[in-house]
Design a protein with these regions (language model features):
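Conserved SAM-binding motif I beta-strand of class I
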Residues: 1-5
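S-adenosyl-L-methionine
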Residues: 6-42
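A conserved structural/catalytic subdomain of Rossmann-like adenosyl-cofactor enzymes
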Residues: 41-179
């Protein structure tokens, strides 16, 4: 198990969580994942991620090979490019993205989608309702599931529209009894 963050509190919480689940030697590092200091490539079999979105990063600090995939400062696109780079061939990723990744019209949005479908196998797109991450974020999100293959593929993509998750979609996120 490996993880990176620039928030030391999140690093401690992550390490404690892994230890509580009997993961004895996690590799949790203080590192800016999309910066030039992170040059990991083709290393991981599985990536599960809820990357930061709706943010930007200083262009000078972004690793050049991420800019080659999608020339942007938007975190939600840079992290997708990072996951594609870090996966081994045959490696799988499931990550949460804002709907803008799916529907954005900028060149950066188009280039990351093109990379996913032309050079990887898109397996699933799971649309989630806008309140599922409240009170932290109120945007509509989706889970993208893909496999790094080196060749494109969208012939068997599972699409699912999740209407609810068993909790109210307001800021209180109360459990719904009839579930």
């Amino acid at each position: 198990f490996t993880g990176f963050d620039t928030d030391r509190t999140m690093l401690r919480i992550s390490a404690m969580n892994l230890m509580l689940h009997s993961i004895t030697h996690p590799k949790i590092e203080y590192k800016d994942s999309v910066s030039k200091q992170n040059d990991i490539s083709g290393k991981y079999d599985v990536i599960l991620a809820n990357p930061p979105f709706k943010g930007t990063i200083d262009a000078e600090s972004i690793h050049d090979n991420l800019k080659n995939v999608t020339n942007t400062k938007k975190t939600e696109l840079l992290f997708l490019a990072l996951f594609l780079r870090m996966l081994k061939k045959g490696g799988r990723c499931a990550c949460i993205v804002p709907d803008g990744v799916l529907f954005g019209s900028s060149k950066a949005h188009q280039s990351i989608r093109r990379e996913i479908i032309e050079n990887n196998q898109l397996r699933a797109v799971i649309s989630m309702p806008s309140g599922v991450f409240k009170p932290y974020a109120g945007v509509s999100t989706a889970v993208l599931v893909f496999t790094r293959t080196g060749a494109g593929g969208t012939d068997q993509v599972w699409f699912y529209d999740m209407k609810a998750d068993g909790f109210s979609l307001d800021d209180k996120r109360s459990e719904i009894a009839e579930n």
